[in-house]
Amino acid sequence: MNELIKHKLELLPDSPGCYLHKDKNGTIIYVGKAKNLKNRVRSYFHGSHNTKTELLVSEIEDFEYIVTTSNTEALLLEINLIQENMPKYNIRLKDDKSYPYIKITNERYPRLMITRQVKKSDGTYFGPYPDSGAATEIKRLLDRLFPFKKCTNPANKVCFYYHLGQCNAHTVCQTNKAYWDSLREDVKQFLNGKDNKIVNGLTEKMKSAAMTMEFERAAEYRDLIEAISLLRTKQRVIHQDMKDRDVFGYFVDKGWMCVQVFFVRNGKLIQRDVNMFPYYNEPEEDFLTYIGQFYQDTKHFLPKEVFIPQDIDAKSVETIVGCKIVKPQRGEKKQLVNLAIKNARVSLQQKFDLLEKDIRKTHGAIENLGNLLNIPKPVRIEAFDNSNIQGTSPVAAMVVFVNGKPSKKDYRKFKIKTVIGPDDYASMREVIHRRYSRVLKDGLTPPDLIVIDGGQGQVNIARDVIENQLGLAIPIAGLQKNDKHQTHELLFGDPLEVVELPRNSEEFFLLHRIQDEVHRFAITFHRQLRSKNSFSSKLDGITGLGPKRKQLLMKHFKSLPNIQKADIEDIIMCGIPRTVAESLRDSLNDPPK
């Protein structure tokens, strides 16, 4: 488990939602749902697991989550996210037709039915539902509440359900199109959670039946009311109109703005985009700028309509974007915008919590390091490393960490000037002298601690330069690596001693990072220099090819093989005379003698 995951686990909410595990490349490898995100996601990184789960956990380098308002929403969102991303560790779900919908047919006497195929022209659809059991349970309740056609009898012959008040598909009922349209709308309102009208009606019927001593009928009404209270299903992540739309929500705090975009395709929320950035104008103005840039990016498909929050001017967005802009006022559409806003708030808060934790962690690390070495808190640390291969192109590098963070503007590179051959001690002496002579000469602020990537010999050389030659008093520590080239020991004191440093401590991680960074910086510089020297040596001796022209070739072609493959005209285009270009080609392409 890496440090990022450790921090994120501490900040997870107790809300329901979906989580997305990612690998080192940022690819989503698993999507899951949870009643409680905090408990579920943490469970992956604690305790024992079966072989399959352990394999999944071994690949997790990061995770994201989307907060929902119910477990049902989380389940349906999970389905959509799996279908969209096809994570390799998820069971391969079938396509949309495998999920059941409840349908009201467009017949003269409409029927309620369960189907797995959606054809918008032949009915009104509700769903999809997680499984056939859930759809069947809801349909049974709808059958008891709404008198759609339930029989195969001809219209002039009433059925058993008619006598129960559950089927009005008969001529004796004198129903018309307006009646069925009204009933269809009642079902839609009911499934969207607006069930007060029906519950109130059932409550009155229950009371009336009890007053007339019809206790069995009253019990039926009571059971219906209880069934409705258990249902209360609000599927904000699904829309019945099957439209493509983008839903924007944003939240601002502490000078930062977070914008969340939900991508709804064919009525289903399948993906989200999150962006956080500092804002400098009014939030509404910066949001308009953001949404304009968002759709300038060709990877973002422009949908039929875009949902935006209430405080944004729709006409301004429409002018920028060029499609229908909607500010939902009520119902599930407004709830979806609110969900985007809620997730924007959660994401921004997580960013602040991570920053605060990181600050506490790095401040704690440098404070603990100071206490461990019995020196003032080392706010500024300068670290050095040498790099050469058998004495060729010897270089050194310095990296700087301020308050536990790399300060790259202060990094420095050194070409070794006075040392011939592979001599790490002499190279270290030269570099330390050059660096801190400049500090004295220019009145620069000296570091609170110098770290040498090396053992006792290099540290003693550095101390001799600092104390005896330059008269400075700067603490110097050494970092030794083991056979696997990993940070192993911290050397400090006079005489030098190994300082016990717990491997799981924040100060150890800080020193490990410093050592890795200075080594990386030195190696990179050395490779660049070797490549440049190799390039130049091959071009030496070619008449008319001086340092400036070599530099032009290096800048344009990057490597000798590229020059060898280039046409004469390409070389001339760099500002090289034709005669020199021809000599160059002949020289590079002649076989060695």
From Swiss-Prot:
Molecular function GO labels: DNA binding; excinuclease ABC activity
Domain GIY-YIG: 14-91
Gene Ontology process terms (BP): nucleotide-excision repair; SOS response
InterPro entries cross-referenced by the UniProt entry: GIY-YIG_endonuc, GIY-YIG_endonuc_sf, GIY-YIG_UvrC_Cho, RuvA_2-like, UVR_dom, UVR_dom_sf, UvrABC_protein_C, UvrC
Swiss-Prot/TrEMBL keywords: Cytoplasm, DNA damage, DNA excision, DNA repair, Excision nuclease, SOS response
Broad class of the protein's primary localization: cytoplasm
A Pfam family this chain is assigned to: UvrC_RNaseH_dom
Family matches, as PROSITE patterns: GIY_YIG (PS50164), UVR (PS50151), UVRC (PS50165)
Positions of the UVR domain: 196-231
Signal sequence annotation: none
Localisation per UniProt entry: Cytoplasm
CDD domains: GIY-YIG_UvrC_Cho (cd10434)
GO cellular component: cytoplasm; excinuclease repair complex
HAMAP family: UvrC
Complex formation: Interacts with UvrB in an incision complex.
Family according to the record: Belongs to the UvrC family.
Function recorded in the entry: The UvrABC repair system catalyzes the recognition and processing of DNA lesions. UvrC both incises the 5' and 3' sides of the lesion. The N-terminal half is responsible for the 3' incision and the C-terminal half is responsible for the 5' incision.
Name by which UniProt lists this protein: UvrABC system protein C
Organism: Streptococcus agalactiae serotype Ia (strain ATCC 27591 / A909 / CDC SS700)
Gene symbol of the encoding locus: uvrC
